[in-house]
């Protein structure tokens, strides 16, 4: 390409037009490199368009004559006069009035001193001058005042165990509680989708407690620790008192009754507190049988702990403390009236036999102590847990009816009166079984003579009918329940074996926790971050303790062929178990930069881990 040097000197270099500079300016470029601005050429220069400024703009940007800012305690209206010299139009700026706020008469009427001018059609040069107005009054947003809620509307009763219940509509600071996430790992698939493993293969579900059992236990813990505001802070020796059942007026006792749970200050355990409202006791006579009830031990009876009177609820009340069984429901809620958020469990003859056997066992234990179950033999006073029923209101009738009991004892004598009460217990058991049979088959209609038309076996019908006529529970058990007791014992032993097998899976979990704790105690300690200290302690790449860092990466920081993190729980458990056993299996450790490869055994890593941990614990 031939270039005329004379004409090229007057032609602007295209590199200047395109890039803003020419790197061949001082290296033989024949074109002109003169620009209309004073921007320096070179690799760090910016395009001419972006750096081009006018003398006026530079003067406005840095003005040495601008007065220094000094805070003033004068009112805001005086600031307009103070800074009037900076902008000649500061007094002409219109006052900002927020939309939706009605203008007051003082704002709508122009004043003589500072008359508000209509906003002219502005240009771009006028925008910076009207951006800030020191005389603008403070902005007060207009918000409608919410109307107070009507006083005559009553709020519906709140269930303390209903999760995700909405809070008050006007309360924006209290959020509804979310349910706990019980599936800490993926639940086991249904049997039809389960993958068949060989005899030597295991998965994560076989290494932990059963998912359903774990979820049940976690729900019980959640119910035990759940609190609810509004109750009294302290009731006798119990704190964190939370209502769990509001019964209103009891159909059995004819008094107002409710159930709470509270934590004892004595032993820290949680107990169920049954409260009877407006019940006054002037002496210790009603509590004379409490010690005998407290010493009663039975698998089918809720143990009574204490009984006392209190005014912590606002009125004189009787409180009886029992053992607490979280998430337990009554027979009435389990089979008759559906509980909120629950479902009814269908009754079968096997379940009826199970209930009959356990009821007879509970009543037999009570009668051996020269006591009577009385009002606790009711569908609403018997709680149900897994394959277990328990009498949950023992001793209440002895306290509530103490005056009538004393009068009857004085009339017929204590032995005769107690014998009559025990006979009534046996009749109540038979009546309760008839009620459950009616739930199963409404044809019975709560009539013991219609049991034969219920479709149940003749053995069960005969057992219930004889129960209403017997006077001796011992002979009744030998005649009707001896064979059924073997079925109950077999079921309980199977349940015990299942729980022991689940417990055995969690028995040695502490070993792996100890290993991970030791590794985290040792690796990446801050006092070994210094190179000199790390070299002296043996943590450099050539040191013996460097193997622990590589092993930590080998266990927890594995990646696949695509570079994604590997989160295989089974692999971590297998590796830590091998480390705990200290087997001689060899494996390869690779550094993060893949420049160091070491073949070691689990035994060597375990010995090194124990040695370093002993060094740390000794303070060396």
UniProtKB/Swiss-Prot annotation:
Pfam families attached to this UniProt entry: Pan3_PK
Q: What's this protein's name?
A: PAN2-PAN3 deadenylation complex subunit PAN3
Q: Note the zinc finger regions (C3H1-type) by start and end residue.
A: 7-36
Q: What does the entry's domain section say?
A: The N-terminal zinc finger binds to poly(A) RNA. Contains a pseudokinase domain. The protein kinase domain is predicted to be catalytically inactive because some of the residues important for catalytic activity are substituted and it lacks the equivalent of the binding site for a peptide substrate. However, it has retained an ATP-binding site and ATP-binding is required for mRNA degradation, stimulating the activity of the PAN2 nuclease in vitro.
Provide the species name: Meyerozyma guilliermondii (strain ATCC 6260 / CBS 566 / DSM 6381 / JCM 1539 / NBRC 10279 / NRRL Y-324)
Question: Which GO cellular component term is one of those annotated?
Answer: P-body
Q: Which UniProt keywords apply?
A: ATP-binding, Coiled coil, Cytoplasm, Metal-binding, mRNA processing, Nucleotide-binding, Zinc, Zinc-finger
Give the protein's function: Regulatory subunit of the poly(A)-nuclease (PAN) deadenylation complex, one of two cytoplasmic mRNA deadenylases involved in mRNA turnover. PAN specifically shortens poly(A) tails of RNA and the activity is stimulated by poly(A)-binding protein PAB1. PAN deadenylation is followed by rapid degradation of the shortened mRNA tails by the CCR4-NOT complex. Deadenylated mRNAs are then degraded by two alternative mechanisms, namely exosome-mediated 3'-5' exonucleolytic degradation, or deadenylation-dependent mRNA decaping and subsequent 5'-3' exonucleolytic degradation by XRN1.
Pseudokinase domain as annotated region, ranges: 226-482
Query: Subcellular localization, per the record?
Result: Cytoplasm
Q: Where is this region: Knob domain?
A: 522-620
| Feature: compositional bias, Polar residues | 63-73, 101-126
GO BP annotations, alphabetical order: mRNA processing; nuclear-transcribed mRNA poly(A) tail shortening
Binding locations of ATP: 274, 323-330, 380-381
InterPro entries (alphabetical): Kinase-like_dom_sf, PAN3, Pan3_PK, Prot_kinase_dom, Znf_CCCH
List residues traversing the bilayer. none
Q: Which residues form a coiled coil?
A: 483-521
